[in-house]
Amino acid sequence: MTVQAFLSLATAFGLSTAAGLNAYIPLLVVALLARLTSLVTLNEPYDAMSSWWVIGVLAVLLLVEVLVDKVPLADTINDVIQTIIRPAAGAILFAATTNVIGLHPVLAAICGVILAGGIHVVKAGGRPVVSATTAGVGNPIVSTIEDVVSFVMSVLAIVVPYLLLALFAIALALFIWWYVRRRQRMV
């Protein structure tokens, strides 16, 4: 595997994961960077993402998502709707960013769906708990944190994918440590 292929996979992994938190942030980041810089190169048919029409639509959808996701109950309805949109965004992002290295689009789409879908399931499952334990007061805070994390992950995935992989490895190690420790306490 070449360095370019590895970096493309790392970028695809990071962007698809970010899409599990907010579908439109990584899509808009990729579209804008592809349109305005040389940091992102999109091959056909994904280069359509960098058109001003698509960028405008993504910006409007992001605005709606950001506003709706801050309101208790509306955020739960939004999460149901996003159950299809976030994995689809993950599929598009994974396929678009690995298209340069020739990864089969179906395999890329499956990877993106799994990554974004997995993150979305965790997010959607945790949000009702936040609503119930904080009487809805915590929703805007948690939603804002999710949006910031999605944006930072998107930028890191493009600019420094090695760093993002290191952060994922650390997060995975911490999760495994927490899970093992929790299981030991239960015994």
Model-derived features with residue positions:
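Cytoplasmic-side transmembrane-helix entry/capping segments in multi-pass membrane proteins
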Residues: T76-A88, I110, T134, P140
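Alpha-helical transmembrane segments of multi-pass membrane proteins
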Residues: L58-V66, G112-K123, L174-W177
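Mid-bilayer segments of alpha-helical transmembrane spans in multi-pass integral membrane proteins
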Residues: A88-T97, I101, P105-G126, V148
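Transmembrane alpha-helix interface/packing and boundary motifs in multi-pass membrane proteins
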Residues: F13-A23, V66-K70
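Hydrophobic, membrane-inserted alpha-helices
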Residues: L7-F13, G90-I92, E146-S154
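C-terminal ends of transmembrane helices
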Residues: L63-D75, A124-S131
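Membrane-interface capping segments at transmembrane-helix boundaries
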Residues: P72, W177-V187
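Helix-coil boundary and interhelical linker segments in multi-pass alpha-helical membrane proteins
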Residues: M1-L7, A34-W52, L93-A108, A157-L165
